[in-house]
């Protein structure tokens, strides 16, 4: 009996001793700073200049690659990029055959939105894509990658950006089957011809696998499989319309997004009698969330918002959006279409014509990026949605979006617009965004309707909205209207 107990212990010890004997890197279990004294001992460098203790990667394909293999580790870097610089931190990868996809890649890219690669720093590329700017060019930032068992965490400036647990039988698209964890090399590489990446501090803590091997076996559901497949295609799965309402916190929202494989845009309600109602409250709000790993969005409430803010202040948001659910009818009555006692429908057809005209006026007059809660009609008309949204009315809305370069939201909560409307808009060249418009802390969904639309309408990455660079924001180019639109 004692002999049987000893055998497993001896086997484990043999494995550990074997690993240590083969391992030729920094001391396991301790944090080692990589500097000029030990750089050549542990790392192979290519086209890297060392100046005053800093590593400069200026040439395309400049790299720092480990001479040792690791599976579990903690790696932290203090870095800076100059404009145009893009790179990758690869792990579980190979020293050779860089053209083949093996292991995982963390993106380093601090360019403005819609400039170059859409994936930004902290993105676990093709697995948990991050499209949100987490750092800026010409500023030092901290990047940390942790691999423990089958868990991967990527943090930027102490904010968790990408989080992934690799299933034991990870499903990968053709050509990506090598994208799994293994004991292999780590490499920092520059992938762009322009700009420079600078590393001023690099620390690594190797972890002997057996000390930390807690592999979680779990089954993904069909929806998670769809999301994983879209992430592997680098489809931008972004919910641009999330609110911190009903007790929902920023940490809860970000955790929900990471767990489900997409990004969030968190919107402030800005307008008359709302918490954000002038430049001062707007700037205070933005200063409070500036470090959060979310898109910063402005929901323009009512029609009066154009009189309350300056374009310069509004341009602090990554994008702005509005709906056509609040306006004044031809009898001078103020309508809020989601409120039955504040909605007046004297004649169905006249109401729909008036609504269509209001949508056109809002899109023509207000410098918004996205039309949200689109095609929403009052509760008493919703059963006749397909009848009332005629081809002529749909065409008018689509044309208004096109001529003003406004994206059309696909709303996961209301499940609008209809597939027919979306197909018509796609054929015309309209861009799309996804949004939930949650009202409670427990009604964030998993973008089910949006995923259905991707399949049924054949949406691709090229069909999707991305925020404009700051210099190209509509609010700065178009300004605000001189009169309220509705």
Feature locations, PLM:
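Structural recognition of the beta-strand scaffold that forms the well-ordered cores
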Residues: 105-108, 264-266, 295, 321, ...
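Short, charged, surface-exposed secondary-structure boundary motifs
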Residues: 116-118, 275-276, 329-333, 442-446
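An N-terminally biased module of ancient metal coordination in phosphate/nucleic-acid-related enzymes
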Residues: 221-304, 378-387, 396-397, 435, ...
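Conserved, mostly hydrophobic/aromatic
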Residues: 241, 320, 373, 408, ...
């Amino acid at each position: 009996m004692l002999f049987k107990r000893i055998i497993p212990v001896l086997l484990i010890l043999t494995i550990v001793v074997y690993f240590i004997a083969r391992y030729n890197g920094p001391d396991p279990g301790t944090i080692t700073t990589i500097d000029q004294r030990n750089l050549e001992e542990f790392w192979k460098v290519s086209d890297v200049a060392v100046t005053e203790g800093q590593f400069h990667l200026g040439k395309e394909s400049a790299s720092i690659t480990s001479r040792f293999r690791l599976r579990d580790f903690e790696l932290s870097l203090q870095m800076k990029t100059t404009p145009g610089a893009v790179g990758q931190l690869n792990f579980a990868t190979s020293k050779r055959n860089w053209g083949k996809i093996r292991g995982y890649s963390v993106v380093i890219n601090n360019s403005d939105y819609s400039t170059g690669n859409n994936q930004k720093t902290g993105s676990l590329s093709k697995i948990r894509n991050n499209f949100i700017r987490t750092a800026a060019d010409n500023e030092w930032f901290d990047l940390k990658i942790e691999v423990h068992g089958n868990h991967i965490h990527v943090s930027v400036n102490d904010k968790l950006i990408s989080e992934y647990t690799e299933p034991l039988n990870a499903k990968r698209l053709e050509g990506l089957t090598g994208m799994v964890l293994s004991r292999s090399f780590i490499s920092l590489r520059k992938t762009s011809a322009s700009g420079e990446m600078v590393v001023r501090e690099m620390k690594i803590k190797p972890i002997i696998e057996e000390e930390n091997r807690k592999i979680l076996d779990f089954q993904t559901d069909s929806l998670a499989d769809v999301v994983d497949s879209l992430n592997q295609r680098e489809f931008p799965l972004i919910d641009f319309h999330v609110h911190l309402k009903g007790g929902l916190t920023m940490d809860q929202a970000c955790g929900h997004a990471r767990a489900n494989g997409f990004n969030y845009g968190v919107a402030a309600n800005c307008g008359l009698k709302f918490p954000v109602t002038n430049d001062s409250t707007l700037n205070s709000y933005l200063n409070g969330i500036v470090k959060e790993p979310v898109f910063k969005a402005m929901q323009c409430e009512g029609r009066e918002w154009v009189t309350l803010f300056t374009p310069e202040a509004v341009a602090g948001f990554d994008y702005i959006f509005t709906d056509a659910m609040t306006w004044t009818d031809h009898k001078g009555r103020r309508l809020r279409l989601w409120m039955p006692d504040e909605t007046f429908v004297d004649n169905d057809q006249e109401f729909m014509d008036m609504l269509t005209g209001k949508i056109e006026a809002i899109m023509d007059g207000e410098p918004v990026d996205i039309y949200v809660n689109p095609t929403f009609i009052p509760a008493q008309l919703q059963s006749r949605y397909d009848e009332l949204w005629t081809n002529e009315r749909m065409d008018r809305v689509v044309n208004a979006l096109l001529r003003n370069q406004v994206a059309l939201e696909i709303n996961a909560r209301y499940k609008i617009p209809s597939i027919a409307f979306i197909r018509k808009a796609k054929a015309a060249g309209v861009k799309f965004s996804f949004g939930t418009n949650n009202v409670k802390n427990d009604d964030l969904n998993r973008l089910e309707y949006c995923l259905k639309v991707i399949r049924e309408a054949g949406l691709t990455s090229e069909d999707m909205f991305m925020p404009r660079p700051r210099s190209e924001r509509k609010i700065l180019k178009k300004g605000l209207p001189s009169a309220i639109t509705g």
